[in-house]
Amino acid sequence: MASSLAQSRISNLQNHLSPLEANNKLRSLVKISPQVSEALSNGRAVVALESTIISHGMPYPQNLQTAKEVESIVRENGAIPATIAILNGVPCIGLSEEELERLASLGKSVQKTAGRDIANVVATRGNGATTVSATLFFASMVGIQVFVTGGIGGVHRHANHSMDISSDLTALGRTPIAVISAGVKSILDIPKTLEYLETQEVYVAAYKSDEFPAFFTEKSGCKAPSRVNSPEDCARVIDANMKLNRQAGILFAIPIPKHHSAAGNLIESATQRALTEAREQNVTGNAETPFLLARVNELTGGTSLAANIALVKNNALIGSQIAVALSQLM
């Protein structure tokens, strides 16, 4: 009797809530900019952009200028930018100039929002800057297939003691979106991060390189699991991943432009010092990465920030080309 009742309830749910209806209900919870909505409806190339780099990655007004320049690069290469953030509890897919300015000026007072934090920020009508994991969630909700960021989170050094592993990795393992980044941040344990990505069944390929990049430097000393040589190569992989209905994501690792990679040794030295200081000051959790990046920037006299901006712009360029190539296959 109980089994029959349960089956009846499941049948009723299926009748009243089809996958399409469920998706429409989810989309009604977010605000999609007119430009992004039109592009998605017409099958045009759209590139998702995270917002933590704006609020926590660099100071105002440099963060606003960089965000505008990155969006311009996306547009110039034939795609529509969709910067994602939560404003007054409303998830926004694509920001107006006024919203972008507000987010940038609020800076670190905006909550750094990973996937686990989304419900709380929405429920409390807060302001949230999305990390990779949260951006993946919202991009997937509205059907964006390509996401550009600076670098993803990963397995932290000494994770065998702290168990500090970014939710970016598990989010990638369950979200079929292509992430374009300069690899993982050099403050992390890159070999262990690659191992964890393999465990999560994430396809990882370096762009025009056989070696996995280390954010501020072209090479990490780790062989890339795979290699792609063009935006079209990347688009074909994404297309096949979608058609096969695989639920894991893709990571395309783009080496930093050569003329900004030269300062890699200086930045690595500063990174080691910053890591030591973080341990001494007991800086942990989601406060660690912003602390380390800010301290490395201080120790390098701004060199690391300039390199960070350069690699994000380069990722936006290549990511846009990938999104356009993908739109031509669909």
Curated annotation (Swiss-Prot):
List of residues binding substrate: K112, V132, S166, S167, D168
- GO MF annotations for this entry? metal ion binding; pseudouridylate synthase activity; RNA glycosylase activity
- What top-tier enzyme class does this entry carry? lyase
Question: Which EC number(s) does the record attach to this protein?
Answer: 4.2.1.70
Q: Where in the cell is it found?
A: Peroxisome
User: By its UniProt entry, which Gene3D superfamilies does this protein fall under?
Assistant: Indigoidine synthase domain (3.40.1790.10)
Where primarily located? other
Return the cofactor note field: Binds 1 Mn(2+) ion per subunit.
Question: What does this protein need as cofactor?
Answer: Mn(2+)
Keyword list (alphabetical) reads: Glycosidase, Hydrolase, Lyase, Manganese, Metal-binding, Peroxisome
Among InterPro entries, the record links this protein to: Indigdn_synthA-like (IPR022830), PsuG (IPR007342)
**Might you report a single GO cellular component term?**
peroxisome
Reaction(s) catalysed by this chain's protein: D-ribose 5-phosphate + uracil = psi-UMP + H2O
Q: Which residues bind Mn(2+)?
A: D164
Q: Which PANTHER family match?
A: CARBOHYDRATE KINASE PFKB DOMAIN-CONTAINING PROTEIN (PTHR42909:SF1), ZGC:136858 (PTHR42909)
Q: Which HAMAP family would you find in this protein's record?
A: PsiMP_glycosidase
- Describe its assembly: Homotrimer.
Name of protein: Pseudouridine-5'-phosphate glycosidase
Q: What is this protein's gene name?
A: PUMY
